[in-house]
Amino acid sequence: MAAAPQAPKRGSIRKTRPLVVKTSLNNPYVISWSTLEREDIHFILQTLEAKFKLIGLQKIEDKKKRKKTALMKKQSCRPDIEISEDPKEPDGDVLVSGWTPVHVRKQLVIGVNEVTRALERNELLLVLVCKSVKPAIITSHLIQLSLSRTVPACQVPQLSERIAPVIGLKCVLALGSRKNTRDFADEVEAIIPRVPSLNVPWLPDRTQGPTDSLETEPSESQDNEILDTSFDDLTKLSKRKLAEGGQASAATLQPLKIKKLIPNPSKIRKPPKSKKSISK
């Protein structure tokens, strides 16, 4: 006898998802911090450490206050225990939490976020970055920012290890001095000549002063010549100047390469849960 025909299985067949390939253009330029010499590293660290110790800049944290807040949280969880609210007057010898000389702290910028904001507003004279920052992309944007604002900046090894314990912080990833600084004026003047220049291909080096040949205001004779010349002659002159400027510029364009990101096909991916299974 012939076998009975089998009924088709119920349920939908899951289709395999196609691999999503992300295409992007890579950056042909390699931007990195300029290297400091050993003598300059020791000089910068010693001058900063000595100045901070001399001024006495330090952040004081009240440990008793932290313990008290932790106890209050524990006691608030227990309703049976009564919390004694006896206000105690602080002793005169107890140090208040915060920065000791506030006016000195206002002259400095500490941390990557503060340094970034101050550079955007063009308020800094000098920027120092710790070399132990991981990943390096955290401070890589400061290279373009400092060069566009004509602010000398460099990467100093062991900056956080040497300066953070003196100030009373856990780490110092970036440090900057404001333009209105008075207490650190001599130190900034001594450090700036030791800072190497940064190299960004698409940004010109603005640390050099403007040349004498460039004139801000045209003379009366030049104005009369411009009025006498026709429109066609002016367009020719402008095109010639643009061509000369393009030849003088040292920046060269680099070819871009297409980068494709393909996900790992051997990775075991969990299938998405259906709405029916979630409702159950």
Curated annotation (Swiss-Prot):
Region feature Disordered, mapped onto this chain: 202-227, 254-280
Keywords: Acetylation, Nucleus, Phosphoprotein, rRNA processing, tRNA processing
Acidic residues bias (residue ranges): 214-226
Superkingdom of the organism of origin: Eukaryota
Residue spans of biased composition, Basic residues class: 267-280
Signal peptide start and end residues: none
Gene Ontology annotations of biological process type: rRNA processing; tRNA 5'-leader removal
Family recorded in the similarity comment: Belongs to the eukaryotic ribosomal protein eL8 family.
Matches recorded under PANTHER family: RIBONUCLEASE P PROTEIN SUBUNIT P38
Coiled coil (UniProt feature): none
GO molecular function, one term: ribonuclease P RNA binding
GO CC aspect terms: multimeric ribonuclease P complex; nucleolar ribonuclease P complex; nucleolus; ribonuclease MRP complex
Residues where Phosphoserine is found: S12, S221, S230
Function as written in the Swiss-Prot or TrEMBL entry: Component of ribonuclease P, a ribonucleoprotein complex that generates mature tRNA molecules by cleaving their 5'-ends. Also a component of the MRP ribonuclease complex, which cleaves pre-rRNA sequences.
Full protein name: Ribonuclease P protein subunit p38
InterPro entries from the UniProt entry: Ribosomal_eL30-like_sf (IPR029064), Ribosomal_eL8/eL30/eS12/Gad45 (IPR004038), Rpp38 (IPR042848)
Compartments in which it is found: Nucleus, Nucleolus
Subunit structure: Component of nuclear RNase P and RNase MRP ribonucleoproteins. RNase P consists of a catalytic RNA moiety and about 10 protein subunits; POP1, POP4, POP5, POP7, RPP14, RPP21, RPP25, RPP30, RPP38 and RPP40. Within the RNase P complex, POP1, POP7 and RPP25 form the 'finger' subcomplex, POP5, RPP14, RPP40 and homodimeric RPP30 form the 'palm' subcomplex, and RPP21, POP4 and RPP38 form the 'wrist' subcomplex. All subunits of the RNase P complex interact with the catalytic RNA. Several subunits of RNase P are also part of the RNase MRP complex.
Residues the record lists as N-acetylalanine modifications: A2
